[in-house]
Design a protein with these regions (language model features):
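Divalent-cation-assisted or electrostatically stabilized phosphate/pyrophosphate-binding catalytic cores
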Residues: 35-62, 95-106, 150-182
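Amphipathic alpha-helical scaffolding segments
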Residues: 11-18, 31-42
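Short, intrinsically disordered, charge-balanced linker/junction segments flanking boundaries
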Residues: 1, 181-184
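Amphipathic alpha-helical interaction segments
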Residues: 23-33
Length: 184
């Protein structure tokens, strides 16, 4: 039984891994309205309007079918969709550093919760997992620093000098580790 459960979880992870870049393209390259993406998530039988939607649904439909916790999965995906929509503010010049931090935490935190929803395990410390996702998004922003700077996308990474970034990221890691330590 354990091996079968593991196999199903692995299949879901692989499907989401294929789905994620297509999902990003719906936002970033296609400028698909959030309402349309929500429709695709809520109603997987929706007919696609273009090749990106077709590819999205090719991965999403079997993933959704394989989900044991469909309601939790959909809830996480809808929260991530809100966070993705909110991240468009990163292209607005007067968006505050605090708002950028909040956007980054939401994207990363919701992504981590979505990934965990693929597993059949019970989540015992949502806050710690959310913080871990935020740290992962901070790292992603560090790796994407050059591309984000060229695109005029405001991130924590391109809004701080190196010393400030080290301090910020170190503090975020300590807070995340502390959140997990409280669980055990």
């Amino acid at each position: 039984m354990f091996l079968l459960d593991f196999q199903m979880e692995l299949e879901r992870i692989v499907l989401l891994s294929h789905l994620a870049p297509v999902y990003d393209d719906l936002f970033d390259k296609r400028n698909t309205p959030k309402e349309r993406i929500v429709l695709l998530l809520r109603e997987p039988s929706t007919q696609p309007d273009n090749d990106e939607e077709l590819m999205f649904l090719m991965f999403y439909r079997p993933l959704f079918q394989k989900m044991n916790k469909k309601r939790s999965f959909l809830s996480c995906f809808l929260k991530l969709t809100d966070a993705q929509e909110n991240s468009k503010k990163q292209l607005i010049a007067n968006t505050s550093k605090e708002e950028i931090r909040k956007i980054t935490e939401e994207k990363g935190g919701c992504s981590a919760l979505l990934l965990f929803s693929l597993l059949d395990a019970e989540l015992k410390n949502e806050k710690a997992l959310y913080q871990l996702g935020a740290c992962c998004q901070y790292m992603d922003d560090i790796f994407d620093w050059h591309d984000d700077s060229i695109a005029n996308r405001k991130t924590i990474a391109n809004g701080l000098n190196i010393a400030e970034l080290k301090s910020f990221y170190s503090q975020a890691l300590v807070e995340t580790i502390d959140a997990f330590d409280k669980e055990f």
